[in-house]
Each structure stands twice: as structure tokens, then as C-alpha cells.
Amino acid sequence: KCSLHINTMQSNLSYKAVENKDADLGLITNPHFFKKVQTIPLFEEQLVFVCGGDAPYQDGLLPSQLDSADEIYIPWSNTFLMWHDYWFGNDPEVKVMLDNIALLRQLLDLKNTWAIMPATLGRKLAEKENCRIVSIENGPEYRTCYAIMNDQRSEHPLIDDFLNELLKTVGNIPEIRLL
């Protein structure tokens, strides 16, 4: 019998949970070094620029043309943070800072607002909502998803089964590249 419990937590807390054997597996986007935890790259996904359907942005947009005061900011990964700091400074004024996507869709209805987000989420919003994906030059790097697990993972063959099914599923998503 297998029981699946899913908890959302920051990457560093996921590492501690795996290291302390409070969790068998973690899926993270910000890798760290922990002696007793393996970090395995699984897949990567492009981050895209998304705005409301009526926003004035056009394809070929440059980050230097953007006003961070119109941004709905979510810190997707460390590489995204470096890109963002490069273009907008270390402490830019943003319209809204979120730590999850619950309010993201509604906030994109505000005038001239924009957000950077994973391509799969952007595609869903563009297909089902009044949103658009706009191509951006010099955009952020792909976001990598990693599996983290205890060094003694061979004790849990279900982890390998789960990861194989996960990769088979996400491998069919056009915006995702398996690693």
C-alpha cells in the first residue's frame, strides 16, 4: 500500500525534510548542497512574459522597455532572481509581490500589468483567460526542476516508479525539456 502526501514548502525546507527523513522525495527549483541528500535535475521549462489581453505590449519586447512598477512578481528560481536583479535592480518597486499563484490571474486584469511565469502556466492563461504571451528578447533562463532524495533511496523503489511516471507525463508537454 502506498500513501501520497503532498506539501508545499521552500526548497531549503524541502532539503531539511528529506535529510531528516520527514519526506522521501522533494521537487525543487533552487538547488542547495546537503551532504545526505541527492539533487537530480529532471526537466526544465521556459519562463515567459504574460500580460492581459488589452495590455500594450508587443512581441520582441526588451526587458529595458518594461516598468517593474507594473509587474506582478513571483520569485520562480534563483536564476530568475539573478535575471530580474540585472534588469530591474536589487530592490525594484513592483506592483504586487506574490509567493504563490493564487491571485495571479486576477491581478493581470489591472492596467498594464505583466508577469514572468513558467510557459505551461502562461499557455493555460492564454488559452482559457483574457491573457497573452508576448515574446521577450534577453528573457530569463529556463527554470530547472530537481528531485531531491535521501542517499538511501534504494530502500524506496516506489520513488523511482513515481519519478518515471512523472517524467513520462511531463515529457509530453511541449514547453518542457527532459534532462
Set out the residue ranges of the language-model regions.
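Beta-alpha-beta core module
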Residues: 34-41, 45, 103-152
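Conserved functional loop/turn residues at catalytic and ligand-binding sites
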Residues: 17, 21-22, 41, 70, ...
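A late-sequence structural motif
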Residues: 135-176
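Short secondary-structure boundary segments
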Residues: 30-31, 53-54, 76-78, 119-121
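Short hydrophobic/charged patches on amphipathic alpha-helices used for structural packing
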Residues: 15, 19, 39, 63, ...
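Secondary-structure junction motif
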Residues: 57, 67-91, 155-159, 163, ...
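Flexible hinge/capping segments at coil-to-helix
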Residues: 36-75
